[in-house]
A protein has these predicted regions:
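Single conserved hydrophobic/aromatic residue that forms the stacking wall/gate
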Residues: 1-11
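Mid-length scaffold segments of soluble, non-membrane domains
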Residues: 15-48
Length: 108
């Protein structure tokens, strides 16, 4: 299944999957440079990939099993000091902050 961001100049796209798994993205038909952070089921950033626009020949893959991803304008993560190993919290519209589930056998 292909997912793309087209026709926009800025980007902040959260992506959620029901299960953690290996993930990959490409930049076909996407005209702005993006960065993507792949996160595990606990919200820990596995890796951040810089993605060049309109590239159909390069896939950007998670370095581990990803449950979440966040696409931002390229360089956003670096400018804000976000790096692999950091953890994210999410706030869904109209709801409280969501903390990704801890690993089995671990408490918060």
């Amino acid at each position: 299944r292909s997912q793309t961001v087209t026709g926009v100049q800025t980007c902040a796209l959260p992506i959620f999957w029901s299960e953690a798994g290996p993930r990959s993205f490409w930049m076909k038909d996407t005209t702005i440079p993006l960065s993507i952070a792949f996160m595990d089921r606990r919200g820990r950033i596995l890796n951040i990939e810089r993605m060049a626009p309109l590239r159909q020949d390069r896939f950007h893959r998670s370095q581990g099993l990803a449950r979440y991803a966040l696409e931002m304008n390229q360089g956003w993560f670096a400018r804000h000091g976000v790096e692999p190993g950091d953890r994210a919290r999410f706030r869904l519209p109209g709801g409280p902050a969501t903390h990704p589930a801890p690993e089995k056998g671990h408490s918060r």
